[in-house]
Amino acid sequence: MNCLRPLAPGGKYLFLATCRGYLNYRAELTVDSLAQKEHQYVLQFPLPSISIPVLVRGVYYEFDKADLTDNSREALDRLVKVLKENPNITIELSAHCDYRGRAEYNERLSQRRAESVVKYLTEHGIEAERLTAKGYGESQPKTVSKKMTEKYPFLHENDVLTEEFILKLKPEQQDVCNSLNRRTEFRVLRTTYGLVDSQGNLVARPQ
């Protein structure tokens, strides 16, 4: 079946990409009012998997504090957008520290940082019951992905950035690994928020 449709010059279009096991993604397209009869537009739809934690890039905190820096707003607004585009998910929002400092202190600090992010999200329209804040301190060091090895050639896929691993590296490489361990992530807990009642009966269709 031919699903092609002409796009009106100057028109604005909203596209939604969905796939089971992945987060939804929306993209907007404004057609050039002076576009020729045939013009190609390319839209990319990065769909993060819900089976693994998703890194929230660009979230920063004041040194040794839980306060979010001003330049974190853009990243947090993107996360708000993701949650609004996926209204049926609940998430665990986690914060992680590097190994420096006492483990108990790092766990408390990371918990307060996770709570700071959750506070921002609720203040921007996300339901509190969809969000769980969790601080892991230094207990979950980052595992190196294949993509990370392209940016950091001294690392290998599936390396785990533990204290023991990091201390064997050069000082500048240690700094990189510690920064990778200091991160904010989220993972999907449920995909049925607002869809079922307390008895498990379907009350709404997925959005």
Regions found by a protein language model. Give the residues of each.
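Conserved phosphate/oxyanion-binding catalytic-loop motifs
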Residues: 93
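Periplasmic peptidoglycan-binding/tethering modules of Gram-negative envelope proteins
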Residues: 1-90, 129, 151, 174-179, ...
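Periplasmic OmpA-like peptidoglycan-binding domain that tethers envelope proteins to the cell wall
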Residues: 96-207
